[in-house]
Amino acid sequence: YRSPDLDIIDLADYLPRVIEEIEMGYRPGARGIALGTVVSEEIRLHIDQAIPLGLLISELVLNAVKHAFPAEVLVEYPAGTAEVRLIGGRTEDEGLVLSVVDNGVGLGGIDPSERDSFGMVLVRTLSEQLGAEITHTDGEAPSVFGTGTQWTLQVRQGGR
């Protein structure tokens, strides 16, 4: 991803490409769901961290695309703007924080971290591999669709 060093990946280039692959494969735009990526600065990671991070982000974005906007909700609120956003940047201590935020129906009281679905097992495993803490909350900007959901991944400087 445009790096002369093949072991280093710039997330500002890599993560938008992960999102593009989801757009091509799952076509969320055809359902009225807009995906967006904001990585506020150049964040370079070793490939050993960047690849599992990309898989983790992909799983969280796909989960939002599949579950945050059920068809009946999109039909009921056709003028609503369905969004899934990926936001990334550095923390004060030079760690990394990434959030996947949607303005969909929300979790409805379900705690996904207690589930043993393949997706949640994958999210937990990749988080552990990265030495990261992952949390989820109801979104802070309710929409016509519901409360939304926010997943936040914090990776300490040096990761593992």
Question: Residues of each region from the PLM?
Answer:
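Short beta-to-alpha transition helix within the HATPase_c
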Residues: 8-25, 31
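Conserved short strand/loop->alpha-helix "switch" segment adjacent to the catalytic nucleotide/phosphoryl-transfer site
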Residues: 9, 27-61, 65-70, 76-83, ...
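Structural preference for long, well-ordered alpha-helical segments in enzyme cores
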Residues: 15-22, 53-64, 88, 122, ...
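ATP-lid-like helix-loop hinge signature
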Residues: 66-93, 138-144
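Short, highly conserved beta-strand within the GHKL-type HATPase_c fold
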Residues: 85-87, 94-101, 150-152
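Glycine-rich/acidic phosphate-handling loop/turn and adjacent ATP-lid/helix
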Residues: 92-120
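ATP phosphate-binding glycine-rich loop and adjacent ATP-lid/helix-beta elements
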Residues: 110-137
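C-terminal end segment of the histidine kinase catalytic
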Residues: 142-160
